Regions:
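Ubiquitin-like/PB1-type beta-grasp interaction modules and other compact soluble beta-rich domains
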Residues: 1-100
Length: 101
């Protein structure tokens, strides 16, 4: 039986509104290299324009710099950024900026 690699994604504030969820569980084929970038692309496919426009700069196609990403509670900046590889059971949190002023 072919097992899947499972990753949980947690959404906060605006992304909860965009997705209508607090959490999404994604499955990828076992053996596939899964990165934060791959997960974002899958989420963009699943949630469409609202998610895509919130996460990506439409002009450059790059992920917007104001978003923070944590893998199992640690910032991806301490790993390999968007190329950080994810393992089965990892939790990716996507955290928009907290408003203030």
């Amino acid at each position: 039986m072919n097992q899947a690699l499972r990753v949980s994604v947690r959404f906060f504030t605006t992304l909860r509104e965009v997705t209508g969820k607090k959490e999404e569980n994604l499955e990828f084929p076992k053996g596939e290299t899964v990165t934060v970038s791959n997960v974002l692309k899958r989420l963009a496919e699943n949630y469409g324009k609202g998610f895509t426009e919130y996460v990506y700069d439409i002009k450059t196609g790059e992920v917007k710099g104001f978003l923070q990403f944590l893998v199992n509670g640690r910032s991806i900046s301490s790993f390999n950024g968007l190329d950080t590889k994810l393992e089965d059971g990892d939790v990716l949190a996507i955290i928009p900026p907290v408003g203030g002023g």
